[in-house]
């Protein structure tokens, strides 16, 4: 620990609340446990593994889409320490994209952030099915309930609580529909109603704090499981931990600037859809191929997204789950002026 830094320690009241949270999560993991776990090696899945080990959890699955994927060493450590059979699904970006059409069909979206993460989830679930694992655990919900996302950490207490309440009310996770499509049941202990209700009563001091000089979220969850070596690991989203975060660069390298500019201009003119970059274009093209003229999401209704025309989830939502626009209620930027870039 460097000079001037301090390790975050719980107060007496926080220790009591941490014990309550530990008890609730322990009850939320069924006995016997599902035999499989989608394991990233981060705090959330490590906590689930800690509870489920000894209740029937035997197999851990980790998707690795790049040689330096941050999840790999952490997931190996967790699986090894708990004696789990660890399946590393090693692939590259083109291999990961083999699941893209199926994921688009199930989720009915061309949102880059959603798909970048969900192709990883789909690959893990597909491997579970191949291995004959009928049911898996996930860490879904912890970030939304306990302020795991860095964009929340600077918010004042009242604003933070309001934002978390709205996030909890609108939580949706691709693992459930993808698992259903693949015939693998998904269980998420953090989404147990008792855990959700408990999290709704927490204040900022239980959610955000400074530990060893670094601001972090999910403070009470970390206090509840101090024996987990990954308790203070930084938050890496699925796309970062697995390596799928390189997909934007990958698609940009596949698309010459002139071809992208022409496609973006044509799609906006003909379809009324704003394409943001080459990755977004690739996903929209798959969306078109999968659904043709009959997407399962409504278009042209009373509350359309200005960026794609598809219906927004609800009147209070400022995020489009179909195209990924945020803030979705702000008018899109005008089409860039000037000539289309020359061919390279």
Name these PLM-found stretches.
Residues 21-29, 43, 47-52, 78, ...:
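Structural preference for long, well-ordered alpha-helical segments in enzyme cores
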Residues 136, 141-157, 168-272, 295-302, ...:
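Mid-to-C-terminal catalytic subdomains of enzymes
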Residues 52-54, 74-77, 102-104, 150-154:
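Short, glycine/charged-enriched secondary-structure capping and boundary segments
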Residues 6-23:
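Adenine-nucleotide phosphate-binding core of ATP-dependent small-molecule kinases
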Residues 1-4, 12, 26-27, 121-122:
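N-terminal glutamine amidotransferase
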Residues 7, 72-107, 135-140, 145, ...:
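A conserved beta-strand->alpha-helix junction
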Residues 20, 24, 31-36, 95-151, ...:
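Conserved adenosine/adenylate-binding substructure
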Residues 5-11, 28, 34-82, 88:
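ATP-dependent adenylation/pyrophosphate-handling site
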């Amino acid at each position: 620990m460097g000079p001037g830094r301090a390790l975050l320690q719980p107060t007496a009241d926080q220790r009591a609340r941490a014990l309550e949270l530990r008890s609730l999560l322990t009850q939320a993991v069924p006995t016997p446990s599902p035999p499989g776990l989608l394991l990233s090696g981060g705090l959330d899945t490590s906590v689930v593994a800690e509870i489920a080990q000894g209740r029937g959890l035997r197999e851990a699955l980790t998707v690795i889409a790049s040689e330096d994927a941050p999840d790999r060493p952490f997931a190996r450590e967790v699986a090894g320490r708990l004696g789990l059979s660890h399946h590393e699904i090693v692939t590259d970006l083109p291999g990961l994209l083999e699941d893209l059409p199926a994921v688009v069909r199930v989720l009915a979206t061309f949102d880059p952030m959603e798909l970048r993460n969900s192709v990883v989830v789909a690959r893990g679930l597909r491997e579970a099915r191949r291995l004959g694992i009928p049911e898996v655990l996930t860490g879904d919900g912890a970030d939304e309930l306990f302020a795991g996302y860095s964009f929340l950490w600077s918010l004042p207490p009242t604003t933070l609580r309001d934002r978390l309440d709205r996030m909890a009310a609108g939580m949706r996770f691709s693992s459930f529909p993808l698992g259903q499509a693949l015939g693998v049941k998904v269980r998420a202990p953090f989404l147990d109603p008792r855990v959700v209700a408990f999290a709704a009563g927490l204040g900022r001091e239980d959610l955000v704090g400074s530990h060893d000089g670094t601001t972090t979220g999910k403070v009470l969850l970390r206090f509840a499981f101090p024996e987990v070596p990954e308790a203070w690991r930084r938050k890496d989203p699925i796309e970062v931990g697995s390596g799928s975060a390189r997909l934007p660069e990958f698609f940009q390298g596949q698309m010459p600037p002139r071809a992208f500019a022409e496609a973006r201009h044509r799609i906006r003119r003909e379809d009324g859809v704003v394409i943001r970059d080459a990755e977004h274009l690739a996903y929209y093209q798959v969306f078109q191929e999968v659904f043709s003229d009959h997407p399962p999401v409504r278009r042209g209704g009373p509350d359309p997204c200005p960026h794609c025309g598809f219906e927004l989830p609800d009147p209070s939502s400022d995020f489009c789950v179909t195209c990924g626009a945020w803030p979705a209620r702000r008018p899109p930027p005008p089409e860039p002026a000037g000539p289309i870039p020359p061919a390279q």
